[in-house]
Amino acid sequence: MQILKDQENLNPDGGSFVLITPPLSPPKQKSLSYTNISRRHGMRACMKGIVYEVYKNQPKLWLQQELIWLRRKRIHPIPKARRNNHVGRWANRHSNVSSSSGSRGRSSVSSRDSSPSYSGALRSAERSISSSPSTIEARRRKSARGNGLNGAIDVANLPFEELPNFCPDMSVLDNRTHPRTLKAEWKGPPLDLSDDPYRDLLHPAELHLASTLRLPCLIYLDNKKRIFAEWHHRRQQGLTFRKTDAQRASRVDVNKASRLWKAFHEVGFFDD
């Protein structure tokens, strides 16, 4: 209770009086009101969520109530910065776990490899596998398929002067009864080879083919020589000469190498 003395107001007898007032009470906390929420009545049971409507009518009170509930449950809200980095943190944790597991796996493998018994057994197994006749024969077949020359000559990297000449005689194209000639299709206008200094080394059908593929005469002669050298050596190995083999042996675009292979193949130059 508070006791207040009023010195100015005097009673009729001339004496002062004492004013006694009740204590000040703190303001009561407002509670969320659900009276303004519309309800549906009907003959059947119906449930409707009103959380958003209550929040929309009294957002501040709703937030206070939620914070009180979180404090009671000892649940701390996640700050905004932590929410933004939540996915990245889980990704980093996953990468750390995978890297640690990988390092543990590597350490276990390295420790196992460092043991004398394991390393000795591994070396002996490798020697037995590498020295087996089937493995050696498989390696020979693979190398023969890879470059077509059993590792003896690398057609694609040899200079033009050192390449053996296995090109066929182009005079067979002069035969009027020959059903096919060198033909190819290419986008763009043909290349003018009228002033090429090496045009005399080409057959007229070859000039037409080189012009269509936009290849100068010297580049055409170089790639023709490489293609037929690769074909000859693959035939010696008993292997077929495919379009991809011509692409590996050539020094031009793979599409142009494919057109050259197709033109020579259709004429029958690759027939055994």
UniProtKB/Swiss-Prot annotation:
PROSITE patterns tied to this protein: SWIRM
**Sample GO molecular function, one term:** transcription coactivator activity
Q: Which residues form the SWIRM domain?
A: 182-272
GO BP annotation list: chromatin remodeling; regulation of transcription by RNA polymerase II; transcription initiation-coupled chromatin remodeling
- Where Phosphoserine occurs, the residues are S130, S132
Role according to the record: Component of the RPD3C(L) histone deacetylase complex (HDAC) responsible for the deacetylation of lysine residues on the N-terminal part of the core histones (H2A, H2B, H3 and H4). Histone deacetylation gives a tag for epigenetic repression and plays an important role in transcriptional regulation, cell cycle progression and developmental events.
The name under which this protein is listed is: SWIRM domain-containing protein laf2
Give the organism, scientific name: Schizosaccharomyces pombe (strain 972 / ATCC 24843) (Fission yeast)
